[in-house]
């Protein structure tokens, strides 16, 4: 983040404007936004504020954020710390005219010591119930939902899809966290597009797997699945 001085930010912003590119930022899921320890609490707040400031300098249209993670015996206190911290970040984003997108993260085995937040439908709903702002919307990662017991359909039917700004796409084996190239796992992408597009979704899709070449190639596969469902494509 320190490398983004005024000169670099100006060049990136000008390049996006010149080529008609839409730029978004994505914070690291490894940074624990549910931090409760002295010094680290303040650092987590500063981390989010700095991303918001950077988005303004770059002209980025959104910032994907995460709820952090908890350990075995501290779920309640860390979840509330996470919600409170994101609430503070949203208040700052409102002042800076920045848009935050909260991502649903992947579930871990039930007996795992560490668990991400939010990692299921109920937790995702809770975050949006406690933080209501036009500057906080949902980034729906479908491969995380795919190996949840309720699946992609359960999330689409259970969430208020008017909150959804971004759909993050990768294939998955239905068993554990892995971002696979579309067509190599068992996600039914035709059905995924049908569910999401029929929900009134008006946001953007974002590939999240492999290399840049993998994602460009995967884009063509995904477009074919969408066309098979009769979904109009704007090139």
Where are these regions (language model features)?
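Short phosphate-binding/catalytic loops that engage adenosine nucleotides
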Residues: 21, 98, 201
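Catalytic-core regions built around general acid/base machinery
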Residues: 7-20, 85-92, 154-155, 191-195
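N-terminal pre-domain/capping segments
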Residues: 1-57, 129, 133-135, 153, ...
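Histidine-acidic metal/acid-base catalytic patches
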Residues: 61, 112, 121-235
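Active-site-proximal loop/turn and secondary-structure-junction residues that shape catalytic pockets
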Residues: 27-31, 67-71, 104-108, 142-146, ...
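Active-site acidic/histidine proton-transfer and metal-coordination neighborhood
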Residues: 17-18, 34-137, 147
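Surface-exposed loop/turn and secondary-structure junction residues enriched for glycine/proline
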Residues: 4-7, 34-36, 108, 183-185, ...
